[in-house]
Amino acid sequence: MKTNFLAFGMSTLVAKNIGSITQVIGPVLDVAFSPGKMPNIYNSLIVKDQNSAGEEINVTCEVQQLLGNNKVRAVAMSATDGMMRGMKVIDTGAPLTVPVGEATLGRIFNVLGEPVDNLGPVEVTTTFPIHRAAPAFTQLDTKLSIFETGIKVVDLLAPYRRGGKIGLFGGAGVGKTVLIMELINNILKAHGGVSVFGGVGERTREGNDLYMEMKESKVINEQNISESKVALVYGQMNEPPGARMRVGLTALTMAEYFRDVNKQDVLLFIDNIFRFVQAGSEVSALLGRMPSAVGYQPTLSTEMGTLQERITSTKEGSITSIQAVYVPADDLTDPAPATTFAHLDATTVLSRGLAAKGIYPAVDPLDSTSTMLQPWIVGEEHYETAQGVKQTLQRYKELQDIIAILGLDELSEEDRLTVARARKIERFLSQPFFVAEVFTGSPGKYVSLRETIKGFQMILSGELDSLPEQAFYLVGNIDEATAKAATLQVES
């Protein structure tokens, strides 16, 4: 069977370097090339042929190993069903390249940068290779600055670093998706930035739900797709490990364009960073490497470092990354989450208990941490206020058992005051979101860091002890709380 490679849009020059499959083991294949025509590591190979049923096969692979005897071992980015020994393979002579730029906003891509949302081809003029060097030391922005999100609980108690990495911990149904969408919305309004969402090895249903919710909350504008604020890249659970291992790099490459060329602040979401490690582990075993601790790949730290080092601030722009972290069997010492923690600047922990109370965002104020919460970075005023809030909430937590058994009346006057203030703080940490307006009917609020600090200082100082705690629930700044208290008084 003679294959016309020119019909596939390949130049005569590239079409000359053609190999053939010698072995297929699941998603891994060995390809033989002519002597002196060996492709480089990370080169993209394309299997273009027909299977025994006469159906076209078009599978992109990535070279991982040079085996000797003019053979290479490559990992397929899609299913290898129907592949046979002897099939022709084209060496493209370059790594995987993906489309970048404004045209990617509002669209969904797979690992190869192909649109999968049935909205037609993407009109792009620029493509970037997914394997790129991290910014050089001289390009890095070493200034520590806070990345204001407009979300009170985050900005006050676990502030994000501009160009930092944040771990997002939370089970199902505690508001992870809504928090992600609010951050996408706020970065556009406050920083004029864009977002890239990388769905790595998660459920297809969740990816679809996220897309539908983004359309509903206007993060993706269906009428005018170019006004959308986010590009989506999906490599879901059903994809081969090669795709799940590389989809994070595809999303990161799209984000790098906005940082380096457009000089914007970019939010990069990776959901879930554990699946990136898991896919690498599967590929490593298939490539015949000796596993290390708990069966993970021996190159775990290197793979994680290669991805994470590219996520940083430069003097031109920044990529701030929020990574959902799945902790297998809740074991924080497992090599996958343990390696991830080494790279994180802050953790945002979502609590099911707070979600059950109806306090959204359900960010746990005591479990969430940030390396930025230091007096010489955020300033004395911010630091003292945050510590005061945490101490009050911690004391309330300690007193809860006593309250449950004996009731509030058995507490000392001082403790009763602490409980009253803690309950106000807990409610004031809630906030109406812009992306939830559709469901709640109350308009979203962006609260600046200065207003957030002022509000919590007033609660801690006792200025607002006379106000009812309902006045602090789901409001923006402290002025809204006092206005709501006045309204409640009139109504009663």
From Swiss-Prot:
Its main location: plastid. InterPro entries: AAA+_ATPase, ATP-synt_VA_C, ATP_synth_F1_bsu, ATPase_a/bsu_AS, ATPase_alpha/beta_chains, ATPase_F1/V1/A1_a/bsu_N, ATPase_F1/V1/A1_a/bsu_N_sf, ATPase_F1/V1/A1_a/bsu_nucl-bd. It catalyses: ATP + H2O + 4 H(+)(in) = ADP + phosphate + 5 H(+)(out). F-type ATPases have 2 components, CF(1) - the catalytic core - and CF(0) - the membrane proton channel. CF(1) has five subunits: alpha(3), beta(3), gamma(1), delta(1), epsilon(1). CF(0) has four main subunits: a(1), b(1), b'(1) and c(9-12). SUPFAM superfamilies: C-terminal domain of alpha and beta subunits of F1 ATP synthase, N-terminal domain of alpha and beta subunits of F1 ATP synthase, P-loop containing nucleoside triphosphate hydrolases. One of its GO terms (molecular function) is ATP binding. Belongs to the ATPase alpha/beta chains family. It comes from Marchantia polymorpha (Common liverwort). Keywords: ATP synthesis, ATP-binding, CF(1), Chloroplast, Hydrogen ion transport, Ion transport, Membrane, Nucleotide-binding, Plastid, Thylakoid, Translocase, Transport. It comes from the Eukaryota. It is a peripheral membrane protein. It is an enzyme of class 7 (translocase). Disulfide bonds: none annotated. This is ATP synthase subunit beta, chloroplastic. Produces ATP from ADP in the presence of a proton gradient across the membrane. The catalytic sites are hosted primarily by the beta subunits. GO terms for cellular component: chloroplast thylakoid membrane; proton-transporting ATP synthase complex. The keyword Ribonucleoprotein does not apply. ATP binds at G170, G171, A172, G173, V174, G175, K176, T177. It is found in: Plastid, Chloroplast thylakoid membrane. Its EC number is 7.1.2.2. HAMAP family: ATP_synth_beta_bact. PROSITE patterns: ATPASE_ALPHA_BETA.
